[in-house]
């Protein structure tokens, strides 16, 4: 499935000439809304009467909103049939126990972080947290990207999986 996800991300980037999730959401005619009354809910994706919607908590930091947009776009591309039954809600974005959440995280990491950016960090012998600062995303998303790159043959050694509850703090 990981190869399918990477292929889907690459197809979108090629077709629309961007990796910006907001631009892709617009190009794909998905309705994007922000709301301030979501509490701890980061965002959600749903389908209603054949219309697709992404809702993002606008109390999040700008970079986190970008991440949620990429994550929810992943649900659109990978899990539309699930969203027709019930909205896909994201309280804990980096949940490793749910297959749909895991796949949406892989999608977001592949969309938002370029292989070349990680490769440059590795070449410059940056440590993990320096790498996260350079690419501009939280360590958990970077870990998803690193796992994907490892599976594609990059010489990366990771000691552990992401903590699924870090956003609850």
Predicted regions and their residues:
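Active-site hotspot residues in diverse enzymes, especially metal/ion-binding acidic/histidine motifs
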Residues: 1-169
């Amino acid at each position: 499935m990981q190869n399918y996800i990477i292929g889907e991300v690459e197809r979108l980037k090629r077709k629309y000439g961007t990796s910006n999730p907001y631009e892709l959401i617009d190009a794909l005619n998905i309705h994007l809304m922000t709301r301030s009354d979501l509490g701890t809910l980061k965002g959600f994706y749903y389908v209603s009467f054949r219309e697709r919607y992404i809702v993002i908590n606008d109390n999040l930091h700008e970079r986190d909103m970008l991440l949620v947009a990429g994550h929810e776009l992943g649900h659109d591309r990978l899990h539309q049939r699930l969203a027709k039954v019930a909205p896909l809600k994201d309280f804990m974005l980096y949940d490793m126990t749910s297959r749909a959440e895991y796949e949406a995280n892989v999608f977001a990491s592949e969309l938002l972080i370029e292989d070349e950016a990680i490769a440059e960090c590795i070449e410059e012998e940056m440590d993990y947290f320096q790498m996260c600062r350079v690419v501009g995303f939280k360590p958990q998303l970077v870990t998803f990207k690193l796992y994907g790159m490892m599976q594609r043959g990059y010489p990366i050694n990771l000691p552990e999986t992401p903590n699924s509850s870090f956003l609850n703090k």
